[in-house]
UniProtKB/Swiss-Prot annotation:
GO terms for cellular component: cytoplasm. Its EC number is 2.1.1.-. It comes from Mycoplasma pneumoniae (strain ATCC 29342 / M129 / Subtype 1). This is Putative tRNA methyltransferase MPN_351. SUPFAM superfamilies: S-adenosyl-L-methionine-dependent methyltransferases.
Length: 213
């Protein structure tokens, strides 16, 4: 978990935020990493689970600039009006991430995302809803490879992804660790080829992945 949290934290801090919103914060490990590196950060830690939020409160009890809110996505989150502010949605499925981003009361323009599934669908959603993917990176931990993305909605030019970019990622194809990249794409290919009744889209994904691996 340490590598993944460190990777997410670095992408958050690169944006030099005054505040962060960890949506689905679980036990608060990301917030701890962030305030260790920048003690002046204001953090809003939210989770649908009151038990998880209680654990986060205990972990961060010495940090007075932390807020803890039981909420499903943005339902009860306050806008602290600190700019820039970065949202984090990590460890959730791509479909749930899409649902949270689409909430009418989403007031954030910068996010770091770490989807557990439905990554291609997430990229399609981002492209269709004026989100620009600025960074894509991979991190390997305990035998699993995780994708982490930074996205924003403040670019003057809207990013429209091609079908191939939705599958491979607009930046991921340039990831420097080619061995990890091929391993990641192979895992994606294995997932799609295992489907019993592949759709036309599934077949297209398989074709694109086979071309690059």
């Amino acid at each position: 978990m340490k590598r993944r949290i460190s990777t997410i934290a670095n992408l958050v801090l690169q944006q030099k935020p005054k505040a962060f919103y960890d949506i689905g914060c679980d036990h608060g490990y990301l917030a701890r990493e962030l305030v260790q590196q920048n003690p002046s950060l204001v953090g809003v830690n939210s989770d649908i689970s009151a038990n998880a939020l209680g654990a986060a409160k205990g972990l961060l009890k010495d940090h007075t600039n932390m807020h803890f809110i039981t909420s499903d996505g943005f339902d009860l989150l306050p806008n602290l009006n600190l700019d820039p502010a970065v949202g984090v949605i990590a460890g959730l499925g791509g479909l749930k991430i899409m649902q949270i981003l689409a909430q009418h009361n989403n007031f954030l323009k910068h996010f770091v995302l770490q989807p557990q599934s439905n990554i291609i669908e997430l990229r399609r959603f981002l492209s269709a809803n004026q989100w620009t993917i600025t960074t894509e990176t991979l991190v390997e931990e305990r035998g699993f490879i995780y994708l982490v993305l930074a996205v924003d909605k403040t670019k003057a030019q809207t990013q429209y992804l091609t079908e191939e970019q939705m599958i491979l990622g607009p930046h991921l194809v340039n990831f420097t660790d080619k061995q990890m990249l091929v391993k990641y794409y192979n895992g994606l290919l294995k997932n799609f080829t295992a489907r019993l009744n592949p759709s036309q889209f599934d077949s297209q994904v398989i074709h694109v992945l086979n071309k690059i691996i």
